[in-house]
C-alpha cells in the first residue's frame, strides 16, 4: 500500500520481462505442475498483433477506419486491451455470474483507477480510490446504517407490554388451536411460578426437550419469566450429543413430554414432564398474573442470559453460547423492522428449535403482536405440504 503507482508499474514490467522466457509454456503443462484447482478466473489479453497494411490503408475512395474482431472466453471475467489510434478496453463477463449492472460497475472502477494512475503516478497505491463518491457513500454510510434503538427491558417485560396492547389477538396458532396473547401469558406465568419453586432463576438453565407445539412456546416464556435461561434440545439428536450438552450445561431440570423422555433418560439430569407441571400449577391454584421481581430467586437484568445454544462441534467439541435478553430483543426488533412484521403478520416457526433462527422467529413475532404459526416437522419439508401450510396460514 505504501508503494507508488509508478513503482508498481515498473515492478510489473520487470516481472513480465523476467517471465517472458516461459511465455510459450502451455496451460496444460502449467496445470500439471501446479496441481489441482483452477489456475485463474480472470483473463487479461493485450491484443498486440499486426494488421496488414493493405487492410488499413487507402484504396481509391474506400478507406478502412478501424478493424476489430470478437471472440469468446470461457472465464467469469475477461479484459481485452485493443491498441490503435486510441487505447480501447473491452470487458467480457459470464452473464450467468454477473449481470450487466455489475459489469458496468467493474468498468467504471477500472476507468477511475486508470485516470488516477495517469493523473498522479507518484500517488501511493493505498490512496487509490476505486469507488465513485456516490458509491462510497452508499456502501460505507447507507448500507452500514444499521444502528437501531435497543428495546428497553427484559424479554418478559417486552412481551408483557405487547400482551397489554393486544390481549385478545392470536399469539400462537398450531393446527386447529389458537392461543391469544392473554391466555399465552397466563399459562406462562403459572408455569414460571412452578419453575421458581423448583430452583429456576437468573443464571440457571432449564433444558427443553419438547416437540413443536404450543407447549414449547409456553415453556420458553415461562423459563424467561422465572428469570432463567433455556437450553433447546432436539430429541432427534444422537444420545451422545444430548448427554454432553446436559452434562456440560448442568441445567436445573429438563422439561419433556412422554414421547421425548427417552432422549434425555440416560443423561442423569432431573426431568419433569410439562403436563405434570401444569397439573401442579392447577392443583396449587397458582396465580396467572405477571410475576413481580420479588418472586424470583434473584434480580433479572437485560444482560442476564436468555438462552444457551450449542455449536455443531464440527471443529471440535460443541461449545455453549449464551445470548442475553438485550441481545435477543435487539435482534428481534431488527428482524421485525427489516421484514415489516406487525400485529397483522403471521410468522412461521420454520427453523428447528435447536437453531438460533427459531429464537429469532419467536421473538420477532411475539414482541410485535404477530401470530406465530407452529407446525409439525413433516409439514415443513419442501413440497406440497409446506405450500399448503403457507397458503392456509396466510
Where does each model-flagged region fall?
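His-Asp-centered acyl/peptidyl-transfer active-site segments
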Residues: 1-68, 95-99, 122-125, 201-204, ...
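Carrier-protein-dependent adenylate-forming modules in NRPS/ANL systems
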Residues: 3, 23, 74, 86-128, ...
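A short catalytic or substrate-binding loop motif that flags glycine-/basic-rich loops and adjacent residues
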Residues: 36-38, 70-74, 164
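Short beta-strand micro-motifs enriched in acidic
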Residues: 80-84
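Conserved adenylate-forming
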Residues: 349, 381-394
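Gly/Ser/Thr-rich phosphate-binding loop
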Residues: 367-372, 392-393
